[in-house]
């Protein structure tokens, strides 16, 4: 997954963390486009599979993990890293916005 994306900016405040991520040209925007990489992320952060997932098919992230946007995967990884480090506090979900340029993501 080296060279997949660049983190342009990270802003941390008391109640949230925001990241601006640019997916490099030619890299997959959907998890289904690189299922091996998606599986590697799962093996590194297996707890994301059981995350509640609102607005997608199924109830848990595992229900859509193999066919979702890369930004959605990064959102769940971010929430889980915050949980594992104790920085999440009351945060239990994330929000992702894709700009007019599909490769620029705001998590």
Annotate each PLM feature.
Residues 1-86:
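His/Glu-rich zincin catalytic helix
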Residues 105-107:
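Conserved small/polar residues in nucleotide/adenosyl-binding loops
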Residues 84-100:
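Post-HEXXH active-site segment of zinc metalloproteases
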